[in-house]
Amino acid sequence: MLLLILLFFKGLVCHEKSIVGPQPLGWHHPAEAEEPLIFRLLHIASFKNHSWSHSQASAWIGDLQTHGWNSTMGTIQFLKPWSQGDFSKEELKNFEALFRLYFHDFPREVHAFAHQFQFEYPFELQISGGCKNVGKTSENFLNGAYQGSDLLSFQRSSWEPSPGAGSRAQKVCEVLSYYKDITEIVQSLLSSVCPRFLSGLIAAGKSELERQVKPEVWLSRGPSPGRGRLQLVCHVSGFHPKPVWVMWMKGQQEQKGTKTGDIPNADETWYLQATLDVAEREATGLSCRVKHSSLGGHDIIIHWGGYSILLILMYVAVIVTLVTLIVMGSWHRKQSSNRNVLSSYISNPTFPLENDTQCPRSSALQLHSAQESWIKNRILKWKRSLNQFW
């Protein structure tokens, strides 16, 4: 079976070369990219016992997933309109057949060599391979892991055991090195096919890959880490691409206790928060600084003021509401007074009675007093509600 796979691999690579022919690689990089984009294939295989296994596979360019694998149908899932790059339908069909054979027979070969490789059930294997284009050259990689620990890597046309991986890694590398065709095929896929496919992906998905979205930044308090201490949280949300630099600062000095963690948003932007635990008396003068490619070199700096953004927004809402009520009350009093005065003149335009001229003023005063009392009651109620946040 292994020989059959090798022959298929070799035929596929040779066929791919005959279709494409020798041609210079076209290198396309986003103008704003800080680092070269990496194309990466990930394969995770779980082995519960001698007869059960499960595989998951995906492909990524940078932090954006571009492909998946439907294990039921044995087909490639193209997750973006440009996921085919500049490969022809025939090339993609051939590679789909290649992966179908690989995912079908890889578990069999692992089961067959499990005892020799000292794999103990249940176990998991992780394989990561890909490339990146740097200027007019390319760099490639392939790494294997056993139970989450580094096992081996493919470097300069040879299989190398990872430092500290022991005799298990040595045995796996010996078997892989014995089959020279495996080394030749892997080398061709990594050094020739992968860079060309990556170049086509970058060109086809240029608008999405170069998308720049500025982050929104705000500060808040986190759960208290202890008496007399504060947890300061800097929220950075909605930015793209993913690379971002966030740090709590005091003046120009970085606060080394800063802890960060990021998660993706549904719109393929990112959210990150940076936390810092400090003594309450040391919070004065702290600020959160954010650097991102979308900002054009103009960093965002938010100074810690001791109040959460929620409380600030509540105060703003209260002030706006109060101003609105006062303006509306004043306008209503004026309109009511004008209507009453006009009514008195219409009823007796020549000789207005004394009590008629005084009545509108009396009504206006009563209305003003009632509205003023209502506004005062509302203000007292809001004040009691706000006191709960202190």
Curated annotation (Swiss-Prot):
Mono-ubiquitinated. Gene3D superfamilies: Immunoglobulins, MHC class I-like antigen recognition-like. It comes from the Eukaryota. The keyword 4Fe-4S does not apply. The keyword Membrane applies. It holds the Pfam family C1-set. One of its GO terms (biological process) is adaptive immune response. SUPFAM superfamilies: Immunoglobulin, MHC antigen-recognition domain. Glycans are attached at N49, N70. T-cell surface glycoprotein CD1e, soluble is required for the presentation of glycolipid antigens on the cell surface. The membrane-associated form is not active. GO terms for cellular component: early endosome; external side of plasma membrane; extracellular space; Golgi membrane; late endosome; lysosomal lumen. Residues 1-14 form the signal peptide. The chain crosses the membrane at residues 305-325. Heterodimer with B2M (beta-2-microglobulin). The association with B2M appears to be facilitated by the presence of the propeptide. Keywords: Adaptive immunity, Disulfide bond, Endosome, Glycoprotein, Golgi apparatus, Immunity, Immunoglobulin domain, Lipid-binding, Lysosome, Membrane, Signal, Transmembrane, Transmembrane helix, Ubl conjugation. InterPro entries: Ig-like_dom (IPR007110), Ig-like_dom_sf (IPR036179), Ig-like_fold (IPR013783), Ig_C1-set (IPR003597), MHC_class-I_related (IPR050208), MHC_I-like_Ag-recog (IPR011161), MHC_I-like_Ag-recog_sf (IPR037055), MHC_I/II-like_Ag-recog (IPR011162). GO terms for molecular function: endogenous lipid antigen binding; exogenous lipid antigen binding; lipopeptide binding. Residues 215-306 form the Ig-like domain. It comes from Cavia porcellus (Guinea pig). Residues 15-33 form a propeptide. Disulfide bonds join C131-C194, C234-C288. This is T-cell surface glycoprotein CD1e, membrane-associated. CDD domains: IgC1_CD1 (cd21029).
